[in-house]
């Protein structure tokens, strides 16, 4: 049993932000119905694919963020499919979409129309620049992807080396962080409806989310009037808090607290540094020379020995690649690697497990991602649509 077992979600989203949002809900037990346009989600054909696949039903991108969902292919531009969709809406708790503002209205399926069919409905959108219902801006006609959101929201400006160009963060945080916030908003709206019986519109913008993610830059600029910029892997107000090269790789050390600093100096056999720079202010003021002292020590030691010296006393870790993560017992003990079937292949695919852990209703991937239109008959039957005389077909 999942915490959201009684929640029915109609998921019209595609690519990453929306599917990741609804994936979080599906992992917690929600019945997520992926309502796909003719031809399906754009990322169904994206690689990588498993090596032994006889047919490429979909790749890892689609599998990862659409696990545990059901699929129905509908063309909202046809009367039959639109009526079928409205029948689904009448039984739904939540509708989620990530189209450009105004797209659903073109099919006469906007929030106001859907509320006529289900007054308690929670309608949620993820857009690059938000929906006019929650705050109209000049950007809302513009398309957006993760890269755009990272650039506008300040993420790229503070990422990278100080003498290098603005740099995109590796994971698609413009999509993923927005997705997480949107899931929080949906669950808050569900709680509000349980107390009041009132549905509402939940709107999360990628640009807004990146500003929230970069919250430090907002108060820094407010305090000193200077725009924060790139500092590599270091921190503007904490030291040492950085990556360092070891003899066989890289490690990170976060010893900015006085006690951790003293323990680091002890491991380095440099009690003089602890005595000369006993507080955060003195360490930050002399960060370049102190960084050189630490780097001289780390480069002479292999990472395992270095981490053994610091273990339990100083926050430190190796910089791991994905193979290292797959080999880490912690990841297996926490069930952070999940095996799911891959249609058309003998081998299973490994995807990231659920990071949310609960003692009574443990979230987990609810099986593989669906084939396109795989659950059409059962979904239309549940909605009371006569699949014999009122067949709902999609026009490609």
UniProtKB/Swiss-Prot annotation:
Signal peptide: none annotated. Keywords: Transferase. Its EC number is 2.8.3.26. The keyword Coiled coil does not apply. It is an enzyme of class 2 (transferase). It holds the Pfam family CoA_transf_3. It catalyses: mesaconate + succinyl-CoA = 2-methylfumaryl-CoA + succinate. The active site is at 175 (nucleophile). The keyword Transferase applies. InterPro entries: CoA-transferase_III_domain, CoA-Trfase_fam_III, CoA-Trfase_III_dom3_sf, CoA-Trfase_III_dom_1_sf, Scnl_mescCoAtase. Belongs to the CoA-transferase III family. Involved in the methylaspartate cycle. Catalyzes the transfer of the CoA moiety from succinyl-CoA to mesaconate to generate mesaconyl-CoA (2-methylfumaryl-CoA) and succinate. NCBIfam families: Scnl_mescCoAtase. This is Succinyl-CoA:mesaconate CoA-transferase. The gene is mct.
């Amino acid at each position: 049993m999942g915490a959201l077992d009684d929640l029915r979600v109609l998921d019209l989203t595609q690519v990453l932000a929306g599917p990741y949002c609804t994936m979080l809900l599906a992992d917690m037990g929600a019945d997520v119905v992926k309502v796909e346009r003719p031809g399906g989600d754009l990322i169904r054909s994206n690689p990588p694919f498993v090596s032994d696949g006889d047919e490429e039903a979909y790749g890892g991108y689609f599998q990862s963020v659409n696990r545990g969902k059901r699929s129905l292919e509908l063309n909202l531009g046809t009367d039959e499919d639109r009526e079928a969709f409205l029948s689904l809406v009448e039984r739904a708790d939540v509708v989620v979409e990530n189209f450009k503002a105004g797209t659903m209205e073109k099919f006469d399926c906007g929030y106001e129309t859907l509320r006529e069919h289900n007054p308690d409905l929670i309608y949620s959108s993820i857009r690059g620049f938000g929906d006019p219902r929650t705050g109209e801006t000049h950007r809302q006609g513009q398309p957006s992807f993760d890269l755009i959101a990272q650039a506008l929201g300040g993420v790229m400006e503070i990422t990278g080396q100080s003498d290098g160009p603005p740099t995109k963060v590796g994971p698609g945080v413009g999509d993923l962080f927005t997705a997480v916030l949107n899931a929080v908003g949906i669950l808050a709206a569900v709680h509000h409806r349980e107390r009041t019986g009132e549905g509402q519109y939940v709107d999360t913008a990628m640009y807004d989310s990146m500003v929230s993610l970069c919250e430090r830059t907002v108060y820094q600029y407010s305090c000193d009037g200077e725009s924060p910029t790139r500092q590599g892997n270091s921190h503007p107000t904490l030291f040492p808090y950085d990556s360092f090269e070891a003899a066989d790789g890289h490690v990170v050390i976060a010893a900015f607290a006085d006690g951790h600093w003293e323990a680091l100096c002890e491991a380095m056999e440099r009690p003089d540094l602890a005595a000369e720079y006993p507080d955060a202010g003195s360490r930050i003021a002399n960060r370049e020379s102190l960084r050189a002292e630490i780097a001289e020590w780390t480069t002479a030691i292999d990472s395992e020995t270095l981490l053994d010296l610091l273990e339990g006393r100083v926050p430190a870790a190796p910089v791991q690649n994905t193979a290292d993560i797959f080999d880490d017992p912690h990841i297996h003990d926490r069930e952070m690697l999940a095996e799911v079937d891959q249609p058309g292949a003998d081998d299973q695919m490994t995807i990231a497990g659920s990071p949310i852990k609960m003692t009574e209703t443990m979230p987990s991937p609810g099986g593989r991602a669906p084939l396109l239109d795989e659950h059409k008959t059962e979904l239309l039957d549940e909605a009371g649509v006569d699949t014999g005389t009122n067949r709902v077909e999609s026009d490609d």
